[in-house]
Amino acid sequence: MGDIKKQKKKFSKPSHPWQKDRIEAEKEMLKQYGLRRKYEIWKTDSLLRKFLNRAKTIIAQRTTQSELEKKQMLDRLYSLGLLKHGSRVEDVLNLTIKDLMERRLQTLIVRKQLARTMLQARQFITHECVAVGHKKITAPSYLVSVQEEPQIRLVKPLNVVQQATLEKTEKEVKN
């Protein structure tokens, strides 16, 4: 059999540890998106940098291979909902970390009002109460594609889940 592949970090730490502006921006993002650790921000930032670097190399090169890579990258970004159809490669350079954070499963559950807070959405996901299609997802950082977005649903009828959904339906009945 083959050797086990060594796991690598999926992020890199900031180059300078004590930048006040960056630390404050990270704290705000932690609160806004209900994140537990700063490395979740750094992972998302690394993914964004990969997209940006690929876009820069594609723009610089004018080969048939770069055209193929351009089409593949744009299709992936369309499917993730980060770009709209008809966008160009140059539009990839305008993406921000907040665009990626808005496509996380945890954020979409709150936006669809299946949970009241980001932390409650995170709890639902880690306790296997959320499914996308027929598959339970246990990672709050799962990037949901546009096709999967309408298929997000709660699975387990926990007391907390029932209470949250009952409150939601009571609000709808009153209005």
Predicted regions and their residues:
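Ferredoxin-like alpha/beta domains used as RNA- or RNAP-binding modules
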Residues: 1-112, 124, 131, 135-175
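Beta-rich strand-turn-strand
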Residues: 115-119, 127
